[in-house]
Every structure is written in structure tokens, then in C-alpha cells.
Amino acid sequence: MEKLDKLSEAFKALLKQEKFSSQSEIVTALQELGFENINQSKVSRMLSKFGAVRTRNTKMEMVYQLPAELGVPTTSSPLKNLVVDIDHNDVLIVVKTSPGAAQLIARLLDSMGKSEGILGTIAGDDTIFITPTKVTPVEVLMQNVTELFESSF
């Protein structure tokens, strides 16, 4: 197996343990596995490459984790735990998430579509803008989105 493949496999195996809360902890663990040339910037690039996000593990600790493979996220997936706050004005709804989770949650919201009153979303790292299909019922859409993630509040 090529050296990069071994590094990628070791990196994925470490993240599956769901116990690393910082990039420096991942660097140390990889160095202990024999990857002595690894540094924080390489770990940062690998986290981005594999789409890793920080989320809460079963012990409620914020740790790096690989996203679930394929498929549209559902409301029964742990994404509910990643929503921090939902607010709105007269035109838009803003959803605040844990760092790195906004695009996954926006994908779920986009899959709901116009039938649920969502014209579209724009997601950054930890913020989602939701545009309703009509300006008037923004409060109704706000209530629907809040109910979708109500277990987070």
C-alpha cells in the first residue's frame, strides 16, 4: 500500500474513534502510529478533504468525525444535535450550527423544497440563510424549521 493510502486509512480509523477534539491531538496520534512528518496543516487539509466535522460524541464531547457516506441526511440523523439557534427577520430565516455542519443541514432543508415553503438555502461553515417561497408566511416557515430541529433546543 502506498504511503499516502496508509496515512489516509490511519487518519480515517482515528476519526472513527470519535475521541479527538483538536487537530494537535490527531497530529500526536498519527505521529505515534509512525507518520513522523505529519503536522497540523496536513491534518487540516485532510479534515477538509474527507469532509470531517466537529460534532458531539456519545459523551457529549466535541470531536472530529467523518460524515455519513452518501444519501440525503434525514431528521432522524444526528444533525439535530448540530443546530445551535434559529432566528428570522421579515425576509430570511437564519440557522446557526456547530462549525462545519451548515452545508449538511442546508442539504436536508433543500431536499424538503418548495412544498415546505423553502425557495432555497445558502450555507457557509456554521450559518444557513433560508429564503422562503413567499415573504408573507416567513413566521410559518420559521415554525416548521424550528419543529424540525426542536429536540436541539
Swiss-Prot record:
A Pfam family the protein falls into: Arg_repressor_C
SUPFAM superfamilies registered for this protein in UniProt: C-terminal domain of arginine repressor, Winged helix' DNA-binding domain
Subcellular location: Cytoplasm
GO cellular component: cytoplasm
Span of the signal peptide: none
Tree of life domain: Bacteria
Job of this protein: Regulates arginine biosynthesis genes.
PANTHER family, per the entry: ARGININE REPRESSOR
HAMAP family: Arg_repressor
Name of this chain's protein: Arginine repressor
Origin species: Actinobacillus pleuropneumoniae serotype 5b (strain L20)
Gene name, Swiss-Prot/TrEMBL: argR
